[in-house]
């Protein structure tokens, strides 16, 4: 049984009612009489919830409160059971599941079982129906099962029902049935079969949540590190030890007092979050959505934030949640494995038990696990903490026996400055980073059991640290370890096709630990304020020098830490078709060694930041920047080094491709004449493959391709671009240039629910627009539906032929975006070479954003010459090359007016935009 002492909580007493007047009134056909028969119970239940909330505000322990609500429901169900005469039958009423454990949050499911030794007769069935109807009328909405013992035997073959029966607790009724639910589970499931099915269930559950505790909107019940991870410990052990409470496992010497305290503390923390989720939503809500994170942070006392750090409170709250989740998932994994190793393995035949083989005097290999040779290994040989992980890499061992993990967790607390300063320990730590085999798994275990955070205290500070945005999908520590895992994948032939250039470069780098160290430190100074890259540079150099690395190697790690964002920002935010941009980047990089390391680190970093961030488009940008920079740094005499050289090189490459394909529809002379009309800018911005596609489309569209007729119809062609992103579509437009072309195009895309990933807007020498777009289809039908393709083409053609002010659609801002405040910032830089202003726009990403920008450009008579579209989570960071309608630079007054108009247009934050 559980603790039912509710005296300290001051709960409102249950209303008085009797069996006679309740059943008589309830069976009446008079609605008013039935309402009176509820005797204020619905209002009382609401008051109980309010009493519990007030008690939590007073500081009453949440564990008492979830037990108190279970007690209240116990009392109510027992009285109602009597009121309907069910206590005079052979029925037994059980609380099952979480309610059976005595754990009820404000709106938790109330799982009950009505059990009979035989089939239920008509009279009893009628009474049960009336009871259930009343329970729904008073607002309990129970999850009710009515079963005979034989029914229960069959139902228990479902492991989820078996789990609920393990928690069954008799409330009232037939005492002879008290132990039947537990006996049924014991009869239907062996310890091994039940363990296996629950572990498989946990693995499937983990996969549903991306196998990480660090989701942006975690489900605190079912996600890794959620309440279910505590429940599974109870399920697999209660089946064997025949105990009812988690603390009983301490008395069985299965669980230590320290582990029980850690589980209890973490469970209390999750229960408190769950209480507030239920209170705020008025329902059984377990998903910690952005909608509730800020308010719950405040309710739980995380109220420290400043104007320059508006997300400080919610980030601290989520950091504590993620740390709690990691502790729960770590303990759950360790304890379920401990159950297998101590209980299941002991029942296996000798030939099926893992064999022990000595590695050295301190460690053995047991099957596919490593284990300390005796329980004093870490105490007598502190260096063995790091030695163990090195041996795992050298011997290809991925896992650790649980008795060793328990000892490791205790030993890790002894890692102090003296330990870190020990040359033997420093050598072992660096040796671990040099050993690539299972490096991610070894570092992950180091992190989960406290070794990494104690050896590098700054790493402990970022453990669980999440930035409150949609761009960074993982905590800093998880992101760092994922980055290192991706680095290792660059050596795996299975991933070579995804990263051909990066893989070849990485495999040629001899000192791979340089990149691993840069990965370890690149985000280590986040959350402190200031420039985290510069702070991380200082710490990384100090760490490397303290570990005996050369000054050159330490400086390389520091340089990579400081400039780890340089390449991605240059490729995504600047015009890398401009030789001056590439030359400036090359000057900052300095040499090919820096470039190779930075390229590999950047690709891994982008892949580890957000699974949706890396795509073929970004890969192409990065590869283009790398290749152009490498030519400059190597002073390659055959490489294009200026604008005209780059144009010539692109044309030459496109001609080679033209000669290698079936080009019977394209005459070479016509191709060259067309290319002369397209202008230099086109060959700076487009790649050879797309040039070939555009050329064929134009030449097969005679009115434009062969006559350059100003009255010719617009050309719109589409093709699949699945390499870029799922459901991505390339659209190429060739039409007479006009001032509102960008605006009407964006409006059409918005009307058809198409998101713009990339845009290249170019004007040919004969005043024809050559516009290329990469679109993401929100509905997912454009690639497979010819009618949708034709509709898009026709809408664009009609819009180009009848260029009026575009009509904007009004769509709801997605739920997640509503919780982020991204200030709209606009800056202008003047480009002397093009006589254009480069407008950078940072704002909240929202439906119809580019359509609204286009409308402002139209109203302000702005000509758009090129655009770079970048979406980073909730933040849009776009660049536009603009002038007035006469291709002249904008005046200072015009820039000010444009900026004001854009900010006014984009500052609308309603349910609809």
Swiss-Prot record:
This is Bifunctional uridylyltransferase/uridylyl-removing enzyme. It comes from Psychrobacter cryohalolentis (strain ATCC BAA-1226 / DSM 17306 / VKM B-2378 / K5). GO terms for molecular function: [protein-PII] uridylyltransferase activity; phosphoric diester hydrolase activity. Residues 476-592 form the HD domain. Modifies, by uridylylation and deuridylylation, the PII regulatory proteins (GlnB and homologs), in response to the nitrogen status of the cell that GlnD senses through the glutamine level. Under low glutamine levels, catalyzes the conversion of the PII proteins and UTP to PII-UMP and PPi, while under higher glutamine levels, GlnD hydrolyzes PII-UMP to PII and UMP (deuridylylation). Thus, controls uridylylation state and activity of the PII proteins, and plays an important role in the regulation of nitrogen assimilation and metabolism. Residues 730-815, 838-913 form the ACT domain. CDD domains: ACT_ACR-UUR-like_2 (cd04899), ACT_UUR-like_1 (cd04900), NT_GlnE_GlnD_like (cd05401). Uridylyltransferase (UTase) activity is inhibited by glutamine, while glutamine activates uridylyl-removing (UR) activity. The gene is glnD. Its cofactor is Mg(2+). Residues 359-729 are annotated as: Uridylyl-removing. Belongs to the GlnD family. The lineage of its organism: Bacteria, Pseudomonadati, Pseudomonadota, Gammaproteobacteria, Moraxellales. Has four distinct domains: an N-terminal nucleotidyltransferase (NT) domain responsible for UTase activity, a central HD domain that encodes UR activity, and two C-terminal ACT domains that seem to have a role in glutamine sensing. It comes from the Bacteria. It catalyses: [protein-PII]-L-tyrosine + UTP = [protein-PII]-uridylyl-L-tyrosine + diphosphate; [protein-PII]-uridylyl-L-tyrosine + H2O = [protein-PII]-L-tyrosine + UMP + H(+). SMART domains: HDc (SM00471).
